[in-house]
Amino acid sequence: MSEALLEIRDLNMHFPIKGGVFQKTKKHVKAVNGVNLTVNKGETLGIVGESGCGKSTLARTIIGLQKPTSGDILFEGKSILHYSHKEMHQLRRNIQMVYQDPYTSLNPRMKAGDIIGAPLKAYRMTNNLERRVKELMDLVGLKADDYYKLPHQFSGGQRQRIGIARAIALNPKLLILDEPVSALDVSVQAQVINLLEDLQKELNLTYVFIAHDLSVIKHTADIVGVMYLGKVMEISDSESFYNDARHPYTNALLSAIPLPDPKKEKMRERIVLSGELPSPANPPTGCVFHTRCPFAQEYCKTNTPILEAKDGNDGHLVSCFYPINIEKKQLISE
């Protein structure tokens, strides 16, 4: 049986909106709203969704950059929300993050070797520092001569490799990958994803891989979850997710992925969502997706669905009153 490394229990991250002369709180932005997730050791959990769905806020909350409004985060079975500063300092040896923009996440005045070695210095692991840094550089596909170069002398893909080398310097157990390839060219994306897969096998890493493109994590994630307005809409193992997605939002995202066969692409019917993503400061009542859902009923406007198994598949959870089944998919394609 797989052992849970990270557990997220009913996590909420609400940001107050203040206004008026006395700056009183008028409402809250529910960036993360009742999220429950489990990541087992050695697995990759993929989190996808549109911009503003709360996935990056979730990442920052997991790593401790912001304290949640309520809920709990467990790492190796222990709650980390009330850790002291010293305990958090030790925890960050085991949880590291790779950021979206490979340029702004690097100090432009520091040499690549110093950037990669910074975590080692912070934890006073300075014995044979230069040799260790060059080993890390070799591990991510950088040359030893790159040690003395500045970030602007590298390509986008190389800069992201520097960020990855820095993240694995302390031999962490969990990496939070916050859209690590979204700022890169498609050809470079594949190289970086292959690197991450190789590192996971070699170093026994566990990933939380955040992306806005389902095609990016199709071949890397063991478990895939979709977020919308701070909530998890659907989550399952990768095979079930891509072959038997049940939530209308998930199916809309999947139908937006181009097919390699032009004939099949031309014949395929897409699920087109109407309207724009509502404001998280003023989410719709009932099911938060009902304003854009092509299958929404009156019941959806006043009642909130829960994330639960459908048709007896305990590993496939859907937050929808009227999930898409095989018959409905056939009607869509006709």
Give residue ranges: language-model regions.
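Short catalytic/signature loops enriched in Gly
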Residues: A4, K18-Q23, D237-E334
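Helix-to-loop junction immediately C-terminal to a conserved catalytic motif
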Residues: I63
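Conserved ABC ATPase "signature" region
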Residues: N128-D145, L254-S255
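Conserved ABC ATPase signature
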Residues: L150-F154, Q158
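A short, proline-enriched helix->beta-strand linker immediately N-terminal to the Walker B motif
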Residues: A169-K173
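P-loop NTP-binding/switch modules centered on Walker-like glycine-rich loops
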Residues: L184, V188-K266
